[in-house]
Amino acid sequence: YQASTSELYGEAKKKPQDELTPFNPASPYATSKLFAYWICKNYRDAYNIFVCNGILFNHESERRGETFVTRKITIGLSKLVLGLQKKLYLGNLDALRDWGHAKDYAEMQYLILQQKKPDDYVIATGKQHSVREFIHEALSHFGIELKWSGKGLQEKGVISRITKNEFKSKDIKVGKEIIAVSKEYFRPNEVPDLLGNAKKARRKLKWKYKIGFKELVRK
């Protein structure tokens, strides 16, 4: 099994992306993963080796590295309400991703390897959310609502409503700016829009994800 990535598609012209969508890698990472994809496919076709590519869209869990945006959001917001951090800086708030849970995706990887014939599969939920939506959902667990003002690098998230009063930090109050945008966190050649179509996996593997977006954020 070879773990491919949705980054293979780059700025794809087709949406959602499936196994037949042309690849258009936009970063050194994606280019290296495309090489691995084709090596597996070539060896399978030439030497009849049982090898499969799983094209995984974004998958998260409690063990996700803290440098990734989802963990950066959840850890940063936790520090804010504990008074350990004053503000959370992020990049593109409108980047769109197809987020699933690693547990569901690991199950599909197992199913891929139980088939009689090797093949390649997209692993995705088919549901898309923005970084901004992830922030709002994470804040809902603290009873905090945001309003946004400004545009681009001047955009900021300000507390508009609080429904819980269990914060150690006295800075958590209506009108407090807690989210800011920084050019430091805009990646070069960032892919702004990814959405997967796992129809083939649902049909051939009888696979379906169980953990939705709201539960994923909660976990």
Which residue ranges define each predicted feature?
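Catalytic helix-loop patch of NAD(P)-dependent Rossmann-fold dehydrogenases
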Residues: 7-53, 61-64
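Short, small-residue-rich loop/turn micro-motifs
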Residues: 5-7, 13, 94, 198
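C-terminal substrate-binding subdomain of Rossmann-fold SDR/epimerase-dehydratase oxidoreductases
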Residues: 64-72, 76-219
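A short, flexible beta-alpha/helix-coil linker loop
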Residues: 57-60, 96
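SDR active-site strand-loop-helix element
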Residues: 1-5, 54-56
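Short coil/loop residues immediately preceding or within conserved phosphate-binding loops
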Residues: 3, 20, 26, 85, ...
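PG/GG-rich flexible active-site loop of Rossmann-like NAD(P)H-dependent oxidoreductases
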Residues: 7, 58, 129
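A conserved hydrophobic position in a structured secondary element of the catalytic/binding core
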Residues: 3-4, 17, 181, 196
